[in-house]
Amino acid sequence: LLTLLLVFSSALTFADDHAANEPAAVETWLCTFNEGKGMADMDKWFDDINEYAKTQTNNKYNLHLWVPNFVSDLKRADIALTVAFPSLAGMAASQEEFFGSKVGSALFEEYQEILDCSSREVWMVTQKRMGMGM
């Protein structure tokens, strides 16, 4: 259920009047911090990835960091990360560029040093209502 809510919420950021019913690809990660790592490490990682994204040709994606306020399984994850893409094709292009580059590969290696992720899923999400003006 947590993943479903994360996926739905992340997809909202791609919606506009013309694409409200187009499915978006959303990748979700549920993670715990590795020993000695914490939110400051993630904040630095986000700074680095945002700088890298400025250089990407395929940078049409949104990143969302989720910190649980209440979940049924309190030990499941320290954070969730969602990466929302406009389509599966957009996801493939972005990931091919990211993982195919030295900088992207180094950023992913750093990500794995910070987090231990127990779950990774890709969902197709279709927005059915936009009430928050996002």
Q: What are these regions, as identified by a protein language model?
A:
Residues K102-E109:
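Outer-membrane beta-barrel domain signature
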Residues F14-K102, I114-M134:
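Short S/T/G/P-rich N-terminal loop/turn motif that feeds into the first structured element of a domain
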